[in-house]
Structure formats: structure tokens, C-alpha cells
């Protein structure tokens, strides 16, 4: 090779080594940058000049080294696995958070547990049974009933407020998903423009990958990179970002004021989720924070009527996309708690008013009255509860939101005197009241067309067979929530370990190691020095030839 050509070989070594040094320094400077991916230099030979042809091969001379590519070091399999498990972890974190919040509401309200109000009511019933005709025991009983209803209303309000909090978080989550999708779309355009030539838009790609990681925690996604370098995103099996088309999620309020998440007008407001699907890791249907928020929240304020039918409780209404009560943490708690209150107040009312004469069939004698309906109609007949219109119309139902203490009894607690027509004390009714409270015996169900008596003990939901009295009923509700919460906590711990393991595996591939980059700097610096010395030697040879000649 001519000496002048050899200078170009040395120059290419200088340039390539300098670029490699810059890349290693760039890696080191971003070692703490969130989402940064290690960049790696690929070097190769420049093209060869053919200077002759020998009998066995071409006679070629190389012209140096070439800076082939600056690539990101990533593992697509680890990325996909991390994003799926990250979404699953977010799903169960919401479940765990919801159960903890409900445990707090059920177990503790303003420093006093709801169970304490149950115990006080039980004590007042026992004292009433000892001396039913006493104005003192009757007054204490009514006062305790009033305190009990206040505490029950406070717990119910807490559940409803938390449900509304989840509802507002749904809108925020949808906005976040749309914002992230728009940002990814913008980065797609920047990457495609930057990579039209031979450039590598690695920093843009880092930002995009970081956003995709964030998006994966909010909604189940799958990504595909097209030939132009843009990323296509499918959310819940439907296109979210394809080419120049970005599909925004939209929230639409249902008749109960809760937000449904849809694909917007472009897809006729079709729902994003099928809530009648089984939520399971086997089907990959337990992924994404948004989905978990919707399931935990439910689609309406539940009450005891939602627990009357096994199929509706577990599977929802056929040919609709409503959320089954059993699948919703908040609605399940609302329904079970309201069932406890409903069964208690109707049993107390029915025991006290069961044998009432016509003069008392005005509702004045029942302890718990309905806000939207009297106990009896003008003919003196009991106004039955109509649950078919729930939750839109609960005016005839003995549900927490439609209850108050009989104002006449608050003024004069002795209206129910527990005195028979023969002027004797009605110990039988007081004893019956105590037995019913303890879950013993039967109580009349006035909603039936004929005189029907049902057990004074109830199951907490249609999936369980064991029956409980009121205090045991409440303990079962709290215990069930604690068990569910424990399961979710275990899943969250397991998922966090899985996500952490996958992230560690990813970092071993894409993460920046300061020791490795320092070794690269030393290596490329030595290569730079070698190229420099090579040029110096060629320079000295040229100088010697020129001066000698």
C-alpha cells in the first residue's frame, strides 16, 4: 500500500476510536438516567481496494476501520415478560389496596369499631328482655338503635366515598393512558425522521421504551416495531396506536354516574373490557391498573338486593357488560354490609310490629322507618319492598340510604310499651327480639304473599352456606375481607418478586456498568493511541523518504 494511503488507515482508526470513546462516555454520564439503555459500538472493515489478481485470489488492500453501528443492547423477550408481569403486579396492587381500605372502614371508624356499636345494641336488647316494660330500658334501646344506625350510615358513607374516589381515579388513568400514547406517537415520528439516513435515534428510543414500560402498568398491551422504526401498540387486543392513527380511550358516565371506559366515537363507544370474562392469570385477563380500578369500583352502589340471586351475584345480567357483584371488591362489601343492616332492622321491626293491631298500623311503632315509604298503606296493609327498581329507586327498601329512626320513638321511646291487652308484660316479644338478634329461631317475612317465617340467621352472600347471627355475620364479613386481602397481599409480594427478578435480568443486558464502560474507555483510548502512533510512524517514513531524496 502507498504510504499516503496508509495515513487514511490510521485516520480511520483515530475517528472510530474517538467515536467509541464518546459513546462510552455517554453511557457513563447516563448511568442514573431512568429508562436509559446501554449503547454498544460495532466496528467493521471499510471496503477493500483490489490491486491485482493472483492465481488463487484477488490481491486486495484494506483502507481502514469503519464505525458500523451504535446499537441499543436490549432483549425483546425480557421486555415483553417484564411488561406483562408489571401490568399484572399493578392489577393486584389495586386489589390489595382496596381490601385494606375496606378493612379499615369496617374495622375502625373515627377511633371506634362498628362491632362496638353491635355489641352495645346486643346489650340493650338483653336489658330490654329483662324488663320490657321499663321506660329506662326502652329509652336505652331506642337511643342505642339510633347510635347504631348513625355508625352504620358512617361506614356505608365511607364505602361510597371510596367508590367515588376510585371512580375519579378512572378518569385520571384514562387521561394518563391517552397522554402516554400521544407521546409515543410523537417519538415514533421523531425516530422515523432521524433514522431516514444512517443515524440511530437511540435516545428517542430510550424515551419511547420508558413510556411503554409505564403504559404496560396501566393497561394490557402488546407492541410490534414496524419496518420504519415506529412502534404499533395493541391494548386489550384492539389497536391503540397503528401508524398515524391514535385511538384515544374515552369515559362515558352510566345511569348511576360511574364512568365506563370505551373506545370512543370511532368505534361506536364499544367497551374496552369484557367484565364477564374470568379474571385469571391462565387467560392473561388480570393485567393493568385501569381494569383493576374498574373491577374494584363496580358499576353502581350495591345493596342487599344484589345478593338475592346467585346467578346475578356471580355472573351479572346476561347479554350485558355489567360488573358481577362477586367480582367487585367494593360492591361486594357494600352488598354484604347492607344485607347485615337490612336483616337486622327488618327483623327488629317485624318482631315488634308482627302482632300489632290496626291502631298501630301507621308505622309509628316500627323502630327503623323508610325515608321514601311508610310501613303501611291507607288500608293498613304492609307496603312490601320492591327491589326490582334498585338501585335507581330504593324508596320501599330497608336499605341504609333509606333508613331513619322512627321520630315518634325518639320523642317518646315508650310507645312500644311491651304490654299485652290483659295488662301483663310482653316478655315473649322481648325474648323473641333477643333470640332473633342472636340468630335463633325464625322471624316473619312480610314480603311474602302469605304468612312465611324464615331463619333468623343468614349467609353473608349466595356462595356461602353457613348461616350467622348478627355479630357473627359481621365477623364473617370482616374475616372474609381479611382473607381476601391476605391472598392479594401474597400475590402482590410474589408479583413484585417476579417483576424485580425480570428487571434485574433486563438490567444485566441493557443497564450500564461503570466498570465495563471504564474498561471500554481504556480499550478505545489504547486503540486511539495505537492509531496515533501508526500515523506518526508513517509520517516519519514519509519525512525520511522526502529528505533523503
Q: For each predicted feature, which ranges?
A:
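Structural signature of extracellular appendage/secretion-system components
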Residues: 1-549
